[in-house]
Curated annotation (Swiss-Prot):
Name of this protein: S-adenosylmethionine synthase
Family: Belongs to the AdoMet synthase family.
Required co-factors: Mg(2+); K(+)
Organism annotation: Listeria welshimeri serovar 6b (strain ATCC 35897 / DSM 20650 / CCUG 15529 / CIP 8149 / NCTC 11857 / SLCC 5334 / V8)
Comment on bound cofactor: Binds 2 divalent ions per subunit. Binds 1 potassium ion per subunit.
């Protein structure tokens, strides 16, 4: 590797990974509830293990949804439909342990501090306080069209294409569990120049050889996802490096909601506030705040105000307005942090109800985000991925 160059690695997982099964179940339940009761409060956690699904959490709603059916339908859609996989949609046990949201939390979310103290006149927006304290990060970079870091973008692309090859039966020996990882080499200007390493671990039928798997992935997977200009004779490939991946899914590892937060975001390329997304309604700023921060960051880069930017938002429970906003452009902007913050404050309403309204979050859009990442999804129409405020933001800041 040339002097002053460096490597960066990100990973993704398939929809059949145990933690992602849990995320998808939690978000499928959220979607089912919010489609009937947009104002429902949902904090739904899922655990999966061999032959068992446990759904727990706090849900406050006036509607009924058939949680066991949602669980089984989600597992079936993912592809766990045979008992010999060690996890089967029809035969697994489904246990539920659901309570209502704590009234101590609810009073701060139902009526924000600003509303309770009479300090704000914008009653409709100020009425909702943040569902918890916490910090969230949003990020964007111009190194891909989707304004995402290249390592996580390619890792997701490999995981998504691998799942497609399985579900369309193009490679009918594949089973649902899989992981991908991509190492990108950056030059001294921090621009991606080549792929150093690709790792794919995919569950498979016991009778297929590793040589056959490797040949098929080089034929049907890598050319469909990776720009060949990034590949060279020194690019390393590790395909099922243990030599066998037959036991997978919840039979191989227990899965939990919220345990793939780096996969869900930027692959470690940007910082993370620690809060998970799946199973949470949009009053939870862990989710809506992170979506808003990505929306802000993406519009800053799309406006040409920076080449790379990280936005931090922070909230106090029961308080509507963010307690802080931070913007770091890594020296890629001609404008000061305060100029950017002033423009963002003028154009983006970052109070919880403002975010919910701005991004139209009280609708069933979450299940589709629970695998292959919440950001940079050109295959989905996600409101926080739009750049519809870029021109207005540019006009506010560029004098």
């Amino acid at each position: 590797m040339a002097k002053n160059r460096h490597l960066f690695t990100s990973e993704s997982v398939s929809d059949g990974h145990p933690d992602k099964i849990a995320d998808q179940i939690s978000d499928a339940i959220l979607d089912a509830i919010i489609s009937k009761d947009p104002d429902a409060r949902v904090a739904c956690e899922t655990t999966v293990t061999t032959g068992l699904v446990l759904v727990a959490g706090e849900i406050t709603t006036s509607v009924y949804v058939d949680i066991p059916k949602i669980v089984r339908d989600t597992i079936k859609e993912i592809g766990y439909t045979r008992a010999k996989y060690g996890f089967d949609a029809e035969t697994c046990a489904v246990l539920t342990a659901i309570d209502e949201q704590s009234p101590d939390i609810a009073q701060g979310v139902d009526e924000a501090l600003e509303s309770r103290s009479g300090s704000e006149i914008d009653a409709a927006i100020e009425a909702i306080g943040a569902g918890d304290q916490g910090l969230m990060f949003g990020f964007a970079t111009d190194e891909t069209e989707e304004l995402m870091p290249l390592p996580i973008f390619l890792a997701h692309g490999l995981a998504r294409k691998l799942t497609e090859l399985r579900k369309t039966k193009k490679l009918d020996y594949l089973r649902p569990d899989a992981k991908t990882q991509v190492t990108v080499e950056y030059d001294e200007l921090n621009q991606p120049v080549r792929i150093d390493t690709i790792v794919v671990s995919t569950q498979h039928h016991p009778d297929i050889t590793q040589e056959e798997i490797a040949k098929d992935l080089h034929t049907y997977l890598f050319p469909e996802v990776i720009d060949p200009s990034f590949l060279d004779e020194d690019t390393k490939y590790f395909i099922n490096p243990t030599g066998r991946f037959v036991i997978g899914g919840p039979l191989g590892d227990a899965g939990l909601t919220g345990r793939k937060i780096i996969v869900d975001t930027y692959g470690g390329y940007a910082r993370h506030g620690g809060g998970a997304f799946s199973g949470k309604d949009p009053t939870k700023v862990d989710r809506s705040g992170a979506y808003a921060a990505r929306y802000v960051a993406k519009n800053i880069v799309a406006a040409g105000l920076a080449k790379k930017v990280e936005v931090q938002l922070a909230y106090a429970i029961g308080v509507a307005r963010p307690v802080s906003i931070s913007i770091d452009t890594y020296g890629t902007s001609d404008y000061s942090e305060q100029e950017l913050i002033d423009g963002v404050n003028a154009l983006f309403d970052l109070r919880p109800a403002g975010i919910i309204h701005m991004l139209d979050l009280r609708r069933p859009i979450y299940r589709q985000t629970a695998a292959f990442g919440h950001f940079g999804r050109s295959d989905l129409d996600l409101p926080w991925e739009r750049t519809d405020k870029a021109e207005a933001l540019k006009k506010l800041i560029v004098k």
